[in-house]
UniProtKB/Swiss-Prot annotation:
Gene name for this UniProt entry: pepA
An example Gene Ontology CC term for this record: cytoplasm
InterPro entries according to UniProt: Leucine_aapep/pepB, Macro_dom-like, Peptidase_M17_C, Peptidase_M17_leu_NH2_pept, Peptidase_M17_N
Pfam families listed in its UniProt record: Peptidase_M17, Peptidase_M17_N
Location in or out of the cell: Cytoplasm
Keyword entries, A-Z: Aminopeptidase, Cytoplasm, Hydrolase, Manganese, Metal-binding, Protease
Keyword Membrane attached: no
Lineage: Bacteria, Pseudomonadati, Pseudomonadota, Gammaproteobacteria, Enterobacterales
Gene Ontology molecular function: manganese ion binding; metalloaminopeptidase activity
Domain of life the protein comes from: Bacteria
Biological processes per GO annotation: proteolysis
List of residues binding Mn(2+) 1: 275, 352, 354
Protein name, entry field: Probable cytosol aminopeptidase
Nucleotide-binding among keywords: no
Cofactor list: Mn(2+)
Length: 503
């Protein structure tokens, strides 16, 4: 879909459809009031007859309104005016896109970006409208033989901004929104791909394609099992040794900083393309969803795509830690003791706590880049789902300023995170009689002890950990990858690049 911004009066629009808001109870927004005045009270008369209350989710399509040049006016319920927050705003945009597609309108001028949203400026409203529109229109039908296509899909959306001074900000919002939405789509496509197709080799092929697309400043290197053995990445290798698919670590290097020697931001993504649990096998119920255990790697891939598309003036390294945890005669066992790349030893008490074993060696590997910061993203623990549910990502960090940056980016983007503690009391739960540490610390504080485990491999740099086990995908009828936290990390990078236009 094509997006653009303009600043104009509603009565002068000749678009196929004009979109304006209505508040509860039956109150016209300022733009709707202008159209009502021109139409000699036609719209307000409809509201008085009870055609539309103005609740969020309601809509009413009007045809050939008197004295209006546009063929149609779409009235969208926005709820109570004083309660219009960012969550309701996104719901309103989502309803708008669905309603426009149902009407068969191929283009529309949307005045909803002029609504007052608490604490949000025009840039935010336009960018979120773009991201939400793309999210609403997303489908994953690559593997279906019969694809459902709309008769006349919406092709062009124009967002109106209050003044001409805001056109530049609106244009930048569209540019950023499209890049972030493309990153989210890329992450969702990877996450939704079945594990018989999307294995570590597939992740590597996608990483190589990304480098080919943005070859001016992006390269990809793929590290296989032989090189991992030479590096001493025994924990990473142990997880994958029960699989017939080779473990591959894909390293995407993007150099956009005018000074290529500036220390990079490193993003590490857990890429378990399928997690059976290994010898500590998972229950059969919903095991199919363990294809989503690579959503951390998918997130990193999507964020790297966004950064390259916007040519951000940063040096960024994205690592996709691809692997598969399967049951086999060669699989690693509970009771095994592994020597990690760092030299620390780990007693395996549960083979289903495998993500941290892949990550610990990857986090040691990235020391060679002398990073400014390292952020890992992983569907790491069911305990984080219990703690924070499916709406908020868990955040842990060994560096307060980095944690605050990420929390700020989460608020700005609406891709929420919440910080959990990393304290010595939790470290004690990882003690082992036979190795430097165990790979699990018991049920209490399971998300935190997983973070504590990783923290033992990140002492040489500033580090943060995002546990996305609850936010990376949805179950049930709407099953599918969410693309989170691409938006959060994209905002973090935009802030780092000095391109923070969000209030």
């Amino acid at each position: 879909m094509e997006f653009s911004v303009k600043s104009g009066s509603p009565e002068k629009q000749r678009s196929a459809c004009i979109v304006v808001g209505v508040f509860e109870p039956r109150r016209l927004s300022p733009i709707a009031e202008q159209l009502d005045k021109i139409s000699d009270g036609y719209i307000s008369a409809l509201l008085r007859r009870g055609e539309l209350e103005g609740k969020v989710g309601q809509s009413l399509l009007l045809h050939h309104v008197p004295n209006i040049l546009s063929e149609r006016i779409l009235l969208i319920g926005c709820g109570k005016e004083r309660e219009l927050d960012e969550r309701q705003y996104k719901q309103v945009i989502q309803k708008t896109i669905n309603a426009l597609n149902e009407t068969g309108s191929m283009e529309a001028v949307c005045f909803l970006t002029e609504l007052h949203v608490k604490g949000r400026n025009t840039y935010w409203k336009v960018r979120q409208a773009v991201e939400t529109a793309k999210e609403t229109l997303y489908t994953f039908d690559q593997l279906k033989s019969n694809k459902v296509e709309l008769r006349r899909p919406l092709r062009k959306m124009v967002f109106n901004v209050p003044t001409r001074r805001e056109l530049t900000s609106g244009e930048r919002a569209i540019q950023h929104g499209l890049a972030i939405a493309a990153g989210i789509k890329a992450a969702k496509d990877l996450g939704n791909m079945p594990p018989n197709i999307c294995n570590a080799a597939y992740l590597a092929s996608q990483a190589r394609q990304l480098a080919d697309t943005y070859s001016q400043n992006t390269i990809t290197r793929v590290i296989g099992e032989e090189q991992m053995k030479e590096l001493g990445m025994n924990a990473y290798l142990a997880v994958g040794q029960g699989s017939q698919n080779e473990s591959l670590m894909s390293v995407i290097e993007y150099k956009g900083d005018p000074n290529p020697e500036n220390r990079p931001i490193v993003l590490v993504g857990k890429g378990l393309t399928f997690d059976s649990g290994g010898i500590s096998i998972k229950p059969a119920d919903s095991m199919d969803e363990m294809k989503y255990d690579m959503c951390g790697a998918a997130t990193v891939y999507g964020v790297m795509r966004m950064a390259a598309e916007l040519a951000l003036p940063l040096n960024i390294i994205g690592v996709l830690a691809g692997c598969e945890n399967m049951v086999d005669g060669r699989a690693y066992r509970p009771g095994d003791v592994l020597t990690t790349m760092s030299g620390q030893t780990v007693e395996v008490l549960n083979t289903d706590a495998e993500g941290r074993l892949v990550l610990c060696d990857t986090l040691t590997y990235v020391e060679r880049y002398e990073p400014d910061v390292v952020i890992d993203v992983a569907t790491l623990t069911g305990a984080c789902v219990i703690a924070l549910g499916h709406h908020i990502t868990g955040l842990m960090a060994n560096h307060n300023p980095l944690a605050h940056e990420l929390l700020s980016a989460s608020e700005q983007s609406g891709d929420r995170a919440w910080r959990l503690p990393l304290t010595d009391e939790f470290q004690e739960q990882l003690e082992s009689n036979f190795a430097d540490m165990a790979n699990i610390g018991g049920r209490p504080g399971g998300a935190i002890t997983a973070g504590c485990f990783l923290s033992r491999f990140t002492r040489k740099y500033s580090w943060a950990h995002l546990d996305i086990a609850g936010t990376a995908w949805r179950s049930g009828k709407a099953k599918g990858a969410t693309g989170r936290p691409v938006a959060l990390l994209s905002q973090f990078l935009l802030n780092r690049a000095g391109q923070n236009d969000v209030e």
